[in-house]
């Protein structure tokens, strides 16, 4: 075991070197192609876990399943006769014949402690470690959508790239992700190019700048010297990547198929540590590659503007006229006196207002699901939380914290949602649920997302406006477990999606209240709701301080 660079990362080379003195960090195992050798894999993992664990997660790249006869080894684990000791997450199929093993899975679960990650996305561990993943092989041809479940396309790669950039921490500098998992090799990684290399994977690696990139399917173990991704619009730092290809489990050559590391999340690492150079670095293999056939110019650069802090006034671009202001898509404007939610508008229903702060006010929702259904709205004309100033954000968090404390006294937890799509004024819905229902909320969102064919990414607790896409539509839900669900898939997004979730059978079981227009109250009822809420909320109302 040896330390790599000056970062908190440890590499484990053999069972004799697996020490219980690994640096404090998130311990992760990664293995190459399993191909049905489940018994051999999980016995080996159990040994490693006892020697140098506990490990938080085991990630499998390449082919997890093998021939039908070989796959029978998994039956004992499905039936509970054998147990998987480390939570294991696998990538999807790389061949059509294996697609059947990934069908009809509930929440991706194959058996206890064995889960299919999905086609692509970003998985964030409880420690904050971010793992980007892309299943399958690059689809042949120019289609934007894959013809089968074992293929990925440009659209999938762009989606992963955007998910990584939108989930960046509050720092103005993008720091990369901790791990990238693909089955396919990136093009350009070796001088003698292999036939299965993908230019799309090269593009993805270059864009999201992982500290570690793991892949498989070539049947060989290969580790390159570390290399640095070129700086771009997302960061002025050249971030370091280590590429590792893992061999097949149980290979005759006894080539390395398992890799262990301990990571401190990039978002909690010092930029100086991430930028610290080592003595054995090589030039980035992706510089100078012609990726034009895989990614168009608009996809590779222009669309990126929606996901990072442009901040042109404080950070100079590479080349060009630094005095020119960044050009951003203009936000449709609407006169404040015609906005229903601006306090200065004659149309605002002031009898719904519970309390008013400097930047925000709290009001009863129009057509509420119940008498505790409230909204946090900006006093001024701001379209979404992503465009709030630091002072605005600070007060918004005070309102959220006050509501959490208030509902806790009632034995309830609260969920906050924001839908920014063709909206002109920031509205954040807050709805409380009995504490015993807290665990059901995320599952209910996932169920409805599947019903409407939506894909969400999971982020840590929302602690800065810079975690949100500065431009472009999105929907988010802040859950009681301090995680955040977010999607930018807003085309044909259901207008009542949040209410669909809240009113579902698993939660409030009141489908008749999905449409707010079906829940309109008489003005006298609204006034009574507001007065009752204001009185109960008074001990937590900081606006009078």
Swiss-Prot record:
InterPro entries: Cwf19-like, Cwf19-like_C_dom-1, Cwf19-like_C_dom-2, HIT-like_sf. CDD domains: MPP_CWF19_N (cd07380). It comes from the Eukaryota. GO terms for cellular component: post-mRNA release spliceosomal complex. Residues 306-329 are annotated as: Disordered. SUPFAM superfamilies: HIT-like. Pfam families: CwfJ_C_1 (PF04677), CwfJ_C_2 (PF04676). GO terms for molecular function: RNA lariat debranching enzyme activator activity. PANTHER family: CWF19, CELL CYCLE CONTROL PROTEIN, CWF19-LIKE PROTEIN 1. This is CWF19-like protein 1 homolog. It comes from Drosophila melanogaster.
